[in-house]
């Protein structure tokens, strides 16, 4: 197995940590399941109560700079200990995070500017202490932490921490139930192997948001909101493998963030964005696969039952929120009896959607999908990339040239589907699939060609107009990349 690659340019001291979300429906039962896993059952555990107050300015200047600042009260035995911690943003968006971390004991729960200036990059963040003067509490977390130390034969040491409690911001609160694996010594591969051992018994979801990020989202009223696409920035001359890593990682982040939200949110848009995220990810893998043949993608078959539930739930949500409502006035026409019948009709897809949402959530409590997603996290980190200090390989075409060929090939596949269109359900389905693959490929390579993408191929558009399968896809079929 290839080793997990960790960038060497991260600030020191740094924290290398894997965050995993756990179901919140039965925390006590879940804790018992964690305790009896074969990895942890015979190891000594330590329980600690933690209360953390996070600080920022009213306009959240620290958050804008990717900085989290907290004071932690730690109660274990004897006198409570207080720690002031500053964390800086590192490899964001992934459950595997590498962040700068500076933590020191303080005499009270008041912030210490002296310690900040002496032991952290505070001079760059706040050279004149104006930010410090404006700092105030913005949210808190308090939870019970159970920790185990796992020492391996390869000399690596990993701290496994189970956190169960809540996040509070003003009058808002949200449950907190997660597992953290922190690498204390050794190679990051240890995190992968230990996490996989636990994932075989416990339903886990990779968690790309830190506690501080969730605290900010809670304060804003946006916790577990739908996460939309945020296309990764790629450049025309960057190596293809680097672009693939950046693009796939962003799409996987969207997918897993919406799965996490789906466990507690009834918002139809969460379901929609989860399915969009998965389609974007699979389409991008199809786009970049020729350049990553040696990477050996995980087997994603374990996700099929879950994604079937998600797809069927999306169909029901569309029926009850988009397809049927416009017909209300035409059907009822002010007739009370017809209005009653119409309401009865609308209740059917709503009830079916409720049942299907429960099925999707039940699927997320099976360990198999989480284990597959966890494999994907580390697979993404193992993707080949060019070291920052290496010159580009002249034998490898840059992204723009490579992308032009790949998107051109997808154009040909779509054109072939349009030419073969017989008006059947199967042929129309094929056209929709090819069109969506092309759309997601163009989105993945956004920013590569000069100027604005959107050049039309008139012949393809004329064929599209003749095919009922492609209504609403104008502008997707004629985009090209490259000269």
Regions from the PLM with identified roles:
Residues 2-483:
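Function-determining surface determinants
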């Amino acid at each position: 197995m290839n080793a997990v690659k960790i960038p060497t340019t991260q600030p020191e001291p740094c924290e290398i940590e894997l965050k995993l979300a756990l179901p919140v429906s039965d925390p006590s039962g879940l804790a018992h399941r964690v305790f009896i896993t074969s990895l942890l059952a015979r190891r000594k555990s330590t329980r600690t109560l933690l209360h953390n107050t996070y600080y920022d300015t009213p306009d959240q200047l620290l958050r804008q700079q990717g900085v989290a600042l907290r004071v932690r009260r730690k109660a274990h035995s004897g006198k409570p200990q207080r720690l002031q911690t500053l964390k800086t943003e590192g490899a964001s968006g992934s459950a595997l995070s590498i962040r700068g971390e500076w933590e020191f004991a303080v005499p009270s729960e008041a912030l210490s500017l002296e310690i900040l200036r002496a032991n952290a990059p505070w001079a760059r963040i706040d050279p004149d202490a104006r930010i410090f003067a404006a700092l105030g509490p913005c949210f808190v977390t308090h939870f019970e932490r159970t920790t185990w130390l796992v020492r391996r034969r390869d000399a690596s040491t990993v701290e496994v921490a189970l956190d169960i409690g809540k996040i509070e911001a003003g009058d808002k609160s949200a449950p907190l139930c997660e597992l953290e694996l922190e690498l204390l010594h050794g190679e990051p591969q240890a995190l992968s192997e230990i996490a996989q051992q636990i994932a075989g018994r416990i339903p886990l979801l990779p968690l790309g948001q830190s506690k501080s990020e969730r605290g900010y989202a809670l304060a804003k009223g946006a916790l577990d909101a739908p996460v939309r696409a945020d296309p990764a920035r790629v450049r025309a001359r960057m190596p293809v493998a680097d672009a693939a890593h950046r693009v796939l990682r962003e799409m996987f982040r969207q997918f897993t963030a919406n799965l996490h939200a789906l466990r507690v949110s009834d918002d139809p848009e969460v379901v929609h964005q989860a399915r969009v995220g998965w389609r974007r990810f699979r389409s991008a893998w199809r786009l970049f696969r020729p350049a990553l043949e040696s990477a050996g993608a995980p087997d994603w078959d374990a996700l099929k039952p879950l994604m079937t539930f998600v797809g069927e739930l999306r169909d029901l949500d569309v029926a009850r929120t988009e397809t049927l409502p416009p017909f209300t006035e035409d059907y009822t026409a002010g007739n009370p009896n017809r209005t009653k019948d119409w309401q009865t009709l609308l209740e059917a897809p709503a009830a079916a959607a409720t049942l299907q949402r429960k099925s999707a959530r039940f699927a997320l409590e099976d360990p198999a999908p989480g284990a597959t997603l966890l494999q994907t996290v580390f697979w993404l980190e193992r993707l080949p990339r060019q070291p920052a200090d290496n010159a580009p390989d002249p034998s490898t075409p840059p992204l723009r040239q490579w992308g032009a060929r790949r998107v051109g090939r997808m154009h040909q596949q779509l054109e072939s589907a349009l030419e073969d269109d017989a008006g059947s359900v199967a042929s129309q389905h094929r056209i929709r699939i090819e069109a969506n693959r092309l759309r997601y490929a163009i989105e993945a390579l956004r920013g590569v060609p000069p100027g604005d993408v959107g050049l039309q191929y008139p012949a393809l558009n004329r064929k599209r107009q003749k095919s009922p399968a492609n209504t609403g896809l104008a502008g997707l079929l004629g985009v090209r990349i490259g000269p």
